[in-house]
Regions:
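Amphipathic alpha-helical segments used for helix-helix packing
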Residues: 86, 90-110, 160-164
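Short hydrophobic/aromatic patch on the recognition helix
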Residues: 34-44
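Amphipathic alpha-helical packing segments from all-alpha helical-bundle domains
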Residues: 60-63, 67, 93, 111-136, ...
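Short coil/turn segments at alpha/beta junctions that flank glycine-rich nucleotide-binding fingerprints
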Residues: 18-22, 73, 94, 136-137
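Hydrophobic alpha-helical connector segments
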Residues: 53, 67-93, 147-151
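C-terminal peripheral helix-coil segments that are non-catalytic and often amphipathic
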Residues: 89, 124-132, 154, 165-187
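Basic, helix-initiating cap at the start of DNA-binding domains
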Residues: 1-19, 24-35, 49
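Alpha-helical DNA-contacting segments of helix-turn-helix folds
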Residues: 52-58
Length: 187
């Protein structure tokens, strides 16, 4: 991604998180980035395309981080622990992006449905790990969809925790608390 596109990406992410999708205009984005509309339209055909790009990049970031980390682990419990830590770290580093993903998850518009589709794909990856853990006896029998959704829900929990604590978050302390609760429930 070139410098201008990255700046549009980062600025849009911040504006969408602060103002919401509907209240953010192309003019807001171009004024904040400091580029002409033509420059923005060279990189993105519409506000909707910018939003879709943000969602896709955000989910890719989560999936790639998890794929890299979990591919090196043999234990399915360790894979779940890695997912928990990655999700907390991503909330801390990319709070605006997570705010957008969570806020746009609800609704029936095309952008909401695309967001839901990407999030469901991510949750399905978690569910595959849970199913495999059940098959080998590392994880007790249970509703794999519910378990995977709960693990994804840690993103929301971490964000709420961060906001309630004025942005202060001890990653490892929060990880230990989430990990303890989740892993106890899986064994």
């Amino acid at each position: 991604m070139n410098k201008t596109k990255r700046k549009i990406f980062e600025t849009s992410m911040k504006l969408f998180a602060e103002k919401g999708y509907d209240a953010t205009s192309i003019e807001d984005i171009t004024a904040t980035v400091g580029v002409a509309k033509g420059t923005l339209y060279y990189h993105f055909s519409s506000k909707e395309e910018i939003f879709n790009f943000l969602v896709e990049e955000g989910i890719k970031l989560l999936q790639n981080s998890i794929d890299i980390k979990t591919s090196k682990l043999e234990s399915y419990i360790d894979k779940i622990k890695a997912i928990i830590l990655i999700e907390i770290k991503i909330v801390v580093k990319y709070e605006d992006l997570i705010t957008i993903l969570l806020s746009q998850f609800w609704g029936k518009e095309a952008r909401n449905q695309k967001c839901q589709k990407h999030i469901y794909e991510y949750i399905n990856k978690i569910e595959e790990i849970v199913k495999s853990g059940i098959e080998v006896g590392e994880i007790k029998q249970g509703n794999t969809k519910a378990i995977a959704s709960e693990i994804y829900g840690l993103i929301c929990s971490a964000l709420i925790f961060k906001l309630r604590n004025n942005g202060e978050i001890d990653i490892m302390k929060l990880y230990k608390e989430f990990e303890s609760t989740i892993i106890k429930g899986l064994k």
